[in-house]
Design a protein with these regions (language model features):
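Cytosolic juxtamembrane N-terminal segment immediately preceding the first transmembrane helix
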Residues: 1-34
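Extracytoplasmic gate region of multi-pass secondary transporters
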Residues: 40, 219-269
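Helix-breaking motifs and short loop linkers at transmembrane-helix boundaries and internal kinks
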Residues: 51, 83, 104-110, 138, ...
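Central cavity-lining transmembrane alpha-helices of secondary-active solute carriers
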Residues: 62-75, 262-274
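Conserved MFS/SLC helix-loop-helix module at the cytosolic interface between two early adjacent transmembrane helices
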Residues: 70-106, 282-285
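Cytoplasmic helix-loop-helix junction between adjacent transmembrane helices
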Residues: 114-151
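Helix-loop-helix hairpin linking two adjacent transmembrane segments in secondary transporters
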Residues: 149-191
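C-terminal transmembrane helical hairpin of 12-TM major facilitator-type secondary transporters
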Residues: 279-329
Length: 411
């Protein structure tokens, strides 16, 4: 039987909204990451202009990271009470304005306060954007789209590198932050093209019931925080000091180090997409455990290779596996979360994981004073990857769970 024109139009509209919601979530996270990485490229010139040390500039990055749970808490609550669209638009406009103001900062103190505020905006985007995207798409496509969404972080890093090469040599560091204000335009796209999710309409509740739901699911939330602490330790433990290993221990030039890093980011993007797709077929935990196990097996080649020809495939495959596991995170956390808490639980757990795992890089650096960088990274990365296998494998899973009315009462 042929479909009626009205039904066909509805299906076309639904598919368009799904694409737009995923695009909004992906672009929001990409541009949020871009705004964050802008500072990492211009630490030296900003420090020079404000007459402060690089340690003091690094403190502004730490300040941003420390405030991310605050943003996840605030915007997550708003997203569960008032819908996903408006809090996401508010958050994007907020961190875009703060980014522009950072480019206008007259001194270090003002700049530091602005980076604190930026951390609130950065912390709020992921959870709200992920819930909007995951609630808008068909369950059979959640995995691969989760991989796309999560790898917006790698895209943001690459985008910051491109903008740095084009903007900084001509207009300086302040112009970099002015470019960082452009994400505000994404809010217009969300306003015009993205609908509020049906799952939110069907799951929304009053504040009293909302508080009881949080209390009822506290064990699940603690598990999600443990999972995200482990996953952030794996990510930062295999990324942050690897360029330092390449430069200080392998004696590679900054250009060669940058080239290897960019190739590894391509691996990250590919891994996120492919393991996200694999999770649609074989399950979330199985996909993540597979990726983490292969990453564990890659450690010897990753830290002991000494030539560019050997390091490139090792770095590519390591980030392919690590970020492959990460590609499953948006869908896994959103499926685990009860509908009435989906704006709050994933984002707040994610950002608390960032906070609790923030010492992994420092521990690696301290350990490298007594060992080599290769030994330090190999030991710490191996440890957190090994811990990751049971944390992921023995945890709960809710692959393909229905969102909205169908999930009410799920414990």
């Amino acid at each position: 039987m042929a479909k009626s024109p009205a039904l066909q139009n509805t299906q076309i509209s639904d598919r368009a909204n799904q694409r737009n919601a995923v695009a909004a979530g992906f672009l929001g996270w990409t541009l949020d990451a871009f705004d964050f990485f802008v500072l990492t490229f211009v630490l030296v010139p900003v420090a020079r202009e404000f007459h402060v040390s690089l340690v003091e500039m690094a403190a502004t990055i730490t300040a941003s990271l420390a405030m991310r749970p605050v943003g996840a808490f605030f915007f997550g609550l708003l997203a569960d009470r008032y819908g996903r669209r408006w809090p996401l638009m508010l958050d994007i406009v907020f961190f875009s304005i703060v980014e522009v103001l950072s480019g206008l900062a007259p001194n270090y103190k003002v700049f530091f306060v602005l980076r604190l505020l930026y951390g609130i905006g950065m912390g709020g985007e992921w959870g709200v954007g992920a819930s909007l995207a995951m609630e808008s798409v068909s369950p059979k496509w959640r995995g691969i789209l989760s991989g796309l969404l999560q790898e917006g972080y790698a895209f943001g890093n690459l985008l910051a590198a491109v903008v740095y090469s084009l903007v900084f040599p001509h207009w300086g560091w302040r112009a970099m932050f002015f470019v960082g204000g452009l994400p505000a335009l994404l809010s217009l796209f969300i306003f015009a093209k993205v609908k509020e999710t049906e799952a939110w309409h069907e799951s929304r509740t009053d504040w009293s019931t909302y508080g009881k739901a949080i209390a009822r699911h506290w064990k699940l939330f603690l598990y999600m925080v443990l999972l995200m602490t482990t996953m952030n330790s794996i990510s930062h433990g295999t990324q942050d000091l690897y360029p330092t290993l390449l430069q200080r221990q392998r004696h590679f030039s900054p250009e060669t180090t940058a080239m290897i890093t960019m190739i590894s980011m391509v691996g990250a993007i590919a891994g996120g997409l492919l393991f996200g797709l694999y999770s649609d077929r074989r399950g979330r935990r199985r996909a993540m455990v597979t990726a983490v196990t292969f990453a564990l097996l890659l450690i010897p080649a990753w830290v002991l290779s000494s030539t560019v020809l050997l390091i490139i495939p090792a770095a590519f495959l390591m980030q392919f596996m690590v970020q492959g596991a990460w590609g499953v995170i948006p869908v896994h956390l959103n499926e685990l979360s009860p509908g009435e808490l989906r704006g709050f639980f994933p984002g707040f757990a994610y950002q608390l994981g960032v906070l609790f795992a923030s010492s992994i890089t420092l521990i690696e650096a301290v350990l490298a004073r007594h060992l080599t960088y290769a030994q330090s990274l190999g030991l710490l990365a191996g440890l957190v990857l090994l811990i990751g296998v049971p944390v992921i494998g023995l945890g709960p899973e809710a692959k393909g769970v229905a969102f909205g009315k169908a999930e009410r009462g799920r414990q």
